[in-house]
Amino acid sequence: MNTLNDSLTAFDPDIAALIDGELRRQESGLEMIASENYAPLAVMQAQGSVLTNKYAEGYPGRRYYGGCEFVDGVEQLAIDRVKALFGAEYANVQPHSGATANAATMHALLNPGDTILGLSLAHGGHLTHGMRINFSGKLYHATAYEVSKEDYLVDMDAVAEAARTHRPKMIIAGWSAYPRQLDFARFRAIADEVDAVLMVDMAHFAGLVAAGVHPSPVPHAHVVTSTTHKTLGGPRGGIILCNDPAIAKKINSAVFPGQQGGPLGHVIAAKATAFKMAAQPEFAQRQQRCLDGARILAGRLTQPDVAERGIAVLTGGTDVHLVLVDLRDAELDGQQAEDRLAAVDITVNRNAVPFDPRPPMITSGLRIGTPALAARGFSHNDFRAVADLIAAALTATNDDQLGPLRAQVQRLAARYPLYPELHRT
C-alpha cells in the first residue's frame, strides 16, 4: 500500500493527536518564555512545503545537484530580504540554528585554542559564548566578563580590562538573559584596541532591531549572528550577517562545507517569508507592543505588594522583550515560581540570576518574555491584566487562590484564537 498521499491524521493518529494537544495548550494559556514566539501560518506553510524533498548543497547558482532552479530562487530571496531588513552587505541564511551560526562564525575566524571573551552564562550569556561543556569552551580558550554586583549591568570598563588582560581573538556581545541594551560602539572600540573580531549574537533581540525599537549592531560588529525565531517570529533557524567581503567568503565556506551539508530549503523558504513579514508596518507595531508589554510587567512587579514578598526585578526594569525576576529574597525559588505560574496556565522558565546561590536546575529567578503575546495581538491593557495575574500568582498565599487566576488566564487567552485553520473538528 502506497502511503505517499496519506494525511498525518489518517496514517499516524498518535502523532496527530499530540500535535493537536500542543496546539490547544499554546492557545489556552499564555506563552511567556522569552525565547518562544508564534510563527505565522504563512511561515509554517512554507516550512511544510515540498521544498523539504530537495537536496541543494552549495549556494545559489553554484550547486552540486541538478534541479535547483526554484531552491535557488527561494534562497536568493531570503538573502536579499534579510540584507535589506538589517542593512547588511552579506548574509548567509543556511545555518540550521543560532548555535550552528555561532559555531560556523568561530570556525571561519578562529583557530582551535584561540581565546574568546563573552558574557558569563551565569550572568546572562549563552552556552555558545564559551561554556566549558559546549563546543565554544572545548575548542577555544574561553574567558568571560560579568555584570556588576552593584547594578547588574555589563561594566564596559571591566570588559575593556578583561580584553587587555586576555587579548582575545574574538569578543562576543550578546545574551540569553539580560534585560538591557548593550553598547555596541564601545564593544567595537574595545575589540579594535586588542585587534579582536567583534561578533554580536542578536538572537534574542533581532526582531526589535528589525522594527527599529532597538539599536542595530550591524554597523558596529565584524559579524552578527541570530536565530530567526524568538522576537523575529520566523521558523527555527539561524543567519549570519556581515559587511566585509573577505569575512563573508570565510563564513560561507565555514557553513558549507565546513559545518553543514545540504541546506534546509523548506526552512529557508520560511525564513524568507518571515523576513518579508518583519519588513511590514504591522511588525514594527507588534515589536513596540512587545517592548511596552515587558516594561508594563516590570513596572507591576516592582510595586510594594510584590516587593514586600522579597520579589525584585533585576536592574529595576527592562529595555528589551524580557523581564528577569530576582527571587533570592523570596519564599519561592525559581522552580517553585515556574510551577506556580504553570498552575495558572502561564508558561515561563526558571532562570539563574547573577551571583545565584541556588543550583542551575532550581535557580533564584524567572525569565518572562512578551513576544508571543504581542504576536497574538495583546494590547497594553491586556499586558496590564497579565502583569496583575502574574503578580497575584507569585504572591498567592495558598493554592486555593490559583484556581480563579487560571480561569482569568483562560478567558483572556480565549479572546485571541490561535491558528483557527489548524483546529481539527
From Swiss-Prot:
Function: Catalyzes the reversible interconversion of serine and glycine with tetrahydrofolate (THF) serving as the one-carbon carrier. This reaction serves as the major source of one-carbon groups required for the biosynthesis of purines, thymidylate, methionine, and other important biomolecules. Also exhibits THF-independent aldolase activity toward beta-hydroxyamino acids, producing glycine and aldehydes, via a retro-aldol mechanism.
Catalysed reactions, semicolon-separated: (6R)-5,10-methylene-5,6,7,8-tetrahydrofolate + glycine + H2O = (6S)-5,6,7,8-tetrahydrofolate + L-serine
Lineage summary: Bacteria, Bacillati, Actinomycetota, Actinomycetes, Mycobacteriales
One GO term (biological process): glycine biosynthetic process from serine
Gene behind this protein: glyA2
UniProt keyword annotations, A-Z: Amino-acid biosynthesis, Cytoplasm, One-carbon metabolism, Pyridoxal phosphate, Transferase
Family in the record: Belongs to the SHMT family.
Top-rank taxon, per record: Bacteria
Residues given in the record as (6S)-5,6,7,8-tetrahydrofolate binding sites: 121, 125-127
Annotated protein name in UniProt: Serine hydroxymethyltransferase 2
